[in-house]
Amino acid sequence: MLPMPQKSSSRPTVSTIARDLGISPATVSYALNDKPGVGAATRQRVLEHAREVGWTPHSGAQALRRGRSGNIGLVLVRDPEEVSREPFYASVTAGIESATSAHGYELLIRFVGGGEEHEIDVFRAWAHRRRVDGVVLLDLASDDHRPAVLEALGLDFAVLGHYEGPEDFVRVSTAEPEDAATVVEHVAALGYDGCLQVTGPLAYAHERRRLELLRRLCSEHGLAHAHERARYAISSGQDAVRRADVTFCSRPAVIASSDLIAVGALRAAAALGLRIPEEMGLVSWDDSLIAEVASPSITALAREPFAMGRSGGDLLVRRIEGTASRGERMQTAPARLVPRASTARP
C-alpha cells in the first residue's frame, strides 16, 4: 500500500513525491518523464502517487529544458467587451488553448486597438523579450503584412482561415466555397429570389472571398444580390439591414456573416414590418446558442470553430517542435447547415 501523502498547502514537487515514496528524486523524475532506468512497478507507483497528490509539470522548468518560453501568443485587434459577446472567437480561442495546453504551452492573449501596426508592435515586443515561441494569426487581410513581419522576427506562426498570399507557412483553411454553395442552394430551394449579404469588414480576406462567392453563385442560380457591411455586433447588423434597399427583389434572404449580425437583422426586419420567414429569410454563417434561442430561431452553418482553433494550435506546436513541415496545410470540413424557423417555403 502506498503511504498516505503528507498534507501540505504547497505545490507537490518531485522531491515531495520522492519523500512520500521513500525513493530518490532522480527515480521520480525518470518515471514522470518516461525515461529508461526505472522498473515498471516503480514507474506505476510514482505515476499513481503523482495523480493522488495532484502533481503537474512545472511549465517554466519544461520551457527551460526545451530552450523555449513555453508560451503561444494570440493578439486580437478588437474591443475585449465586443469579443466577450462573440461566440465564434470565444470558441476558436478555447480550441487553441485546448491544443496548446495539451502540449505543455501557455496561451498569452492580448487585445489591442488601432489596427495592424499595434498588433505588430506586440509581436516585436514578444520577440525581443522571447516571451512566445509562436503566434496564431486570425482575420488575415488580402494584403496582410503580419506573416512577413513574423518571418523577419524569427517567430513561428500558424494562420487560421482564408488567406490570399504565399502558402509556405502552416495554416488551417476554411471551406468557404462549399459553405457558400450550401447557403445559396438552401435559399434558392425555398423560393427566395435574392440574397442580401451582410458581411463583416471587407479588409478581412475571408469576407472578400465570401462576397465574391455569393455574387457568382447568386448569378448562377438566377438570384438577385445586394450587399451591406457591418461590424460583428447586433446593433451594426440591425443598422445594415435598415439602410438596405430590401425591394431589390420580391422575397430576399439575408445572409449574415455572424450570428450577432443575424440577430441584428431580426430586429431590423421587425422594425421594417417584414415577417420572417414568410417575407424575408435569414441565414447566419456562424451557428451558436444565440442563433438557436433567437425568436424565430436562425438557420445557420455549423462550422465547429472549437475544432478549427484546436487544429491551429496543434499545428503551430508541431511546427515549433519540428514535426510539421513548412507549408503544411489542414482543411476544415465543410459546414453543416442547420435549418431553423428563419427560412421556409412561402
Language-model segment annotations:
Residues 138-181, 260, 286-298:
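Flexible loop/hinge segments that line or gate small-molecule binding clefts
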Residues 118-131, 237-248:
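Short, well-structured alpha-helical segments in soluble
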Residues 79-91, 109-118, 172-182, 198-242, ...:
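Hinge/beta->alpha junction and helix N-cap segments in small-molecule ligand-binding domains
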Residues 27, 68-81, 186, 194-200:
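Short beta-strand segments enriched in small/hydrophobic residues
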Residues 1-70:
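N-terminal helix-turn-helix DNA-binding module of bacterial transcription factors
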Residues 225, 246-346:
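Flexible loop/turn connectors
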Residues 55-121:
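Amphipathic helical "hinge" segments at domain boundaries
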